UniProtKB/Swiss-Prot annotation:
Keywords: ATP-binding, Nucleotide-binding, Transport
Protein family (similarity comment): Belongs to the ABC transporter superfamily.
MF terms in GO: ATP binding; ATP hydrolysis activity
Taxonomic source organism: Lactococcus lactis subsp. lactis (strain IL1403) (Streptococcus lactis)
Domain ABC transporter: 4-243
The protein's name: Uncharacterized ABC transporter ATP-binding protein YmeB
Pfam families: ABC_tran
InterPro entries in alphabetical order: AAA+_ATPase, ABC_transporter-like_ATP-bd, ABC_transporter-like_CS, Metal_Ion_Import_ABC, P-loop_NTPase
Residues the record lists as binding ATP: G36, L37, N38, G39, S40, G41, K42, S43
Length: 259
């Protein structure tokens, strides 16, 4: 099964080219980072994958569902998305495990009390993620980093085949960001671990769990492939159109402007 297969995708909006001839394939066992500066087309690409926006031309297949020939509502139940845009949708007094279980219904509201058996599933997931300390706490009492961990747990309650993290560390301080990245490592070790697509403009967030990298600039794929083949000064200088230095420290990559 192919996770994502985009062929010659173009997206035009108000006579402006947003995405230009995008071809990209994600296979099982691969975790990808989409790296690009603001305005590169990352969000538009995400909307196409989620069928929230329609391509101008090209072919899109996600989890073996070809857009135009498959059932999109069923496909959406197999995909989870985490982004800062979701964080403000929840009631401040909702308990952590209740919030996690709302993911079963793709809702931000608690329409009925959940049973202990239902909530035990949410609690067990939080324990597996190393987030046992969040159980029983109100959403409003959590830090930004803890809220993001909770939202990721919520996204996993349906056991999705594809998990997309859209700028998941936005608004997090240094320590919260590092903790969140470690949480992703734990998720990757779950028996039901989904394929990860991580959208970012920070190279230092590319950890060892990610196998591949797609470099997006001004709506075009500049390079794509195994991360170790792309995270070097020659390719990234070409990508950023500014001379950069690439340093690796403790299995992380740091890109800085060259003197």
């Amino acid at each position: 099964m192919t996770i994502i297969n985009l062929k010659n995708i173009n997206l035009t909006r108000n006579k402006k080219e947003i995405l230009k001839d995008i071809t990209w394939k994600v296979n099982p066992g691969e975790n990808w980072v989409i790296l690009g500066l603001n305005g590169s087309g990352k969000s538009s690409l995400l909307k196409l994958i989620l069928a929230e926006e329609w391509k101008t031309s090209g072919e899109i297949t996600v989890l073996n569902t070809q857009f135009g020939n498959g059932e999109i509502p069923k496909l959406r139940k197999r995909i989870s998305v985490v982004g800062s845009f979701i964080a403000e949708r929840f009631q401040p007094n909702i308990k952590a495990e209740n919030l996690v279980y709302t993911g079963k219904f793709n809702s931000s509201m608690l329409y009925k009390p959940y049973t202990d058996q239902e909530l035990d599933e949410a609690r067990q997931l939080l324990r597996q993620m190393g987030a046992k300390s969040l159980i029983g706490r109100n959403y409003a009492s959590l830090s930004q980093g803890e809220k993001q961990v909770l939202l990721i747990a919520r996204s996993l309650i349906l056991k999705p085949e594809l998990l997309i993290l859209d700028e998941a560390t936005n608004g997090l301080d240094l320590f919260a960001k590092e903790k969140l990245l470690k949480q992703l490592q734990q998720i990757n070790q779950l028996k039901t671990a989904p394929t990860l697509i991580y959208i970012s403009h920070h190279p230092d967030e590319i950890t060892d769990i990610f196998t591949h990298l797609l470099l997006l600039r001004e709506g075009k794929v500049i390079q794509s492939g195994k991360k170790e083949n792309l995270l070097n000064e020659k390719i990234l200088t070409d990508f950023y159109q500014e001379k950069v230095e690439v340093h690796r420290f403790e299995q992380k990559y740091f890109v800085i402007p060259a003197n």
